[in-house]
Amino acid sequence: MTIHHEPDSIVLHHPSECNGCPNRDHCSESMFSVKESRYVVDIEMRANVTEHRILCAKGCPKHEKYIVGSFPENVSAHVQYGDSVSTLANILSTFGAVSDSRISTIMRNLFDITISPGTIVSMVSRCANKVRDRLGAIKNEIISSEVTHFDETGIRINGKTLWVHNSSTNKYTYLTVSDKRGRIGMDENGILPKFKGIAIHDCWSSYWKYDLLHGLCNAHILRELKGIVDNRPEHQWPKLLCELLHDMKSAKDDAVGNDYDTVPLNILDSFDNRFHCIMEIAERECPPPPDPQVRRRGRRKVGKERALIERISANWVSMKRFVHDMRVPFDNNQAERDIRNVKIKVKVSGCFRSLQGAKNYLDITSYLSTAKKHGINAVKALNALLSGQSNIIFSDPSE
């Protein structure tokens, strides 16, 4: 562990022989030298109360009248909570995924501060209102990016299932909520309708409705292939395709490590040849079912294995895009990481009580996630936000 600042206090430990020595008072400190130092890092669990007083003056020699001072703009009530309390409450609510009632309990137990869950909701709401000035800039940065990751997950709001839509890059995160998982919810998120780059996703059908270049999450496909290997061990095609995807990833990693602009053409051709051979095996091992005697409306049921074969065959160009374009990743882990905290929040705290509460949480999480990607920790980012300096999240801390 590293000590990041000078010690706040120093405790000296004299030799045990000095304790009770009749000559101790005659020994000067210059007789002693430091043999070894050890450090104990601790925190103080207490509230800090600052009293603000405005003063008045009678008979000022300059103004010759009664003059009165004024309180700072941020000191507006007789008793109020400071920015540090609001910062901690918001961090616990977002990154900590703690419910409002538990935040109230934590504050009372740690600092002997009694804050009602309603007050915590108000703190989060005020913070979210300040964050929204920055969300437009975050959104525009993602729209103008070359590669963006997309994902969605369900949450419960007041007993109803709604959907969180995530759009993110390695520098920016933008989260919104909608009652629709598909095209309507994606349009409400506002990124995909204006996006012109490469969209990375898990092959959910609604993403294909946008006229874009697409890249698929091959880690997701590998998980599906493994499921087939476990359930149908006699089939060879899923094993062969897993090996092919791993070989493609290794080739991409080697190309990046050698600063190549692309994977060599002969290697790319060999990947295509292997893929087509594997698909021929897949057709033999799991052929399409015969046409039903009675045709019914809707999509024909073909089983999970056959559905995966058809999906992979139709989207091979998007699957292999990561070896043709060095900007495209092998998987969609970026989006999954950025949306993971939402899943943790739901698991730990349960459902949101209101749609506005969910929006507040997602707006603050978008801001804090973006700040983290720029090397700025959550405490510094929220303190900057509350003091009107939220542009700090777009700065480079190394400069």
What kind of feature is each model-predicted range?
Residues 1-76, 121, 150:
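Short, flexible loop/hinge motifs at secondary-structure junctions
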